[in-house]
Amino acid sequence: MYAKIIQGIQDDVELREELQKIFESKSHKAMVKYSLLLGRHIMDLTNTQPCGEISEAYEISEKWLEGKAKFTEARAAAIKIHRLAHNEEDPVMEKVYRIMVQVAATPHVKNHALIASDYAIKLINTMYPDNAQEVSRERQEQIKLMKSL
């Protein structure tokens, strides 16, 4: 069942439900790996270079996957990126930061991976208003990334 996490997004409900079914079959570690892949995809899509806070979050997530970092470190990294999002005036970059907050927080709670996916759709809605084809393309990419793990 489609659990709407982010309000006010124009989504492809069928593809979102498919993504959620795949999500439910995956481990917490797999979803951390997915979040990192999704974040890289979003940075490529928006031609964004990772700032120090995002790089730190990626390092912590990689260490968490190796059992060398605690989820509290990931949560602290997410809070740093949240501050960037809160102060960002450019609507595209604000969404990129919101996605990265969720990517950074995924070692803390698995569901943050799904929230990052929904924020990515909100980003697509901002970049391509009223464009169902771009939304579907993004959901298909998310499904592909998630299935790869």
Identify the role of each PLM range.
Residues 1-139, 147-149:
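Structured binding/interaction patches within domain cores
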